[in-house]
Amino acid sequence: MKKRLYQNDAASYFREHSSIFLFIVILFLMGVIFGAIVVNSMSITQKEDLFYYLSQFFGQILNGKVAENNDLFAQSFLHNSKFIGLIWILGISIIGLPVILILLFIKGLVVGFTVGFLVSQLGLKGFLLAFVSILPQNLIIIPVFILMAALSVIFSLRMIKKQFFKTYGQPILPFFKNYILTFVAAVVLISAASGVEAYVSPWLMKTMMGTLNL
């Protein structure tokens, strides 16, 4: 009974704020597209220089000279947790709203640029390499970032209404409690994504590189 009630509340919440969630998704996709455009706007020299460093990285992976899995996990978890934490903090500040949107756009840009560069330099091989090295962890990370950004925007808008519209009667505290719980859940999911990035993706990447003779 409680589970069904929570599901109904969640569905009602998403319907109520569907326009914000849609805007956040579109903004992220715009970042991805812009990242791919940036790749196409690079000069041949810039692409060659960047691909040289990428080739060095490929060689390190094949030779097993990359960081230990535990170190990769710590780096990934710290990086993504900082990003999520920053978005969460910006959500409780009135002036943080535009920064949240900028950060999400940048995240999309990075993903679009990374995939776009691999495809532009290696074609189908680059796509397959991106599929095994970037996609697995981002199947968790991207939805978490999008959800956290949307909830931060919603909470920030509530703060603005509470501050500037005295007729706004909804209490902030219940929303803030849920906001904290959402952040905790996001961190748990980020830890799972970091585990995939540290222990699964490197093996998949090395296997794919051996298969593709990179």
What residues fall within each predicted segment?
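N-terminal signal-anchor transmembrane alpha helix
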Residues: 14-47
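Interfacial helix-start motif at the membrane-water boundary
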Residues: 59-88
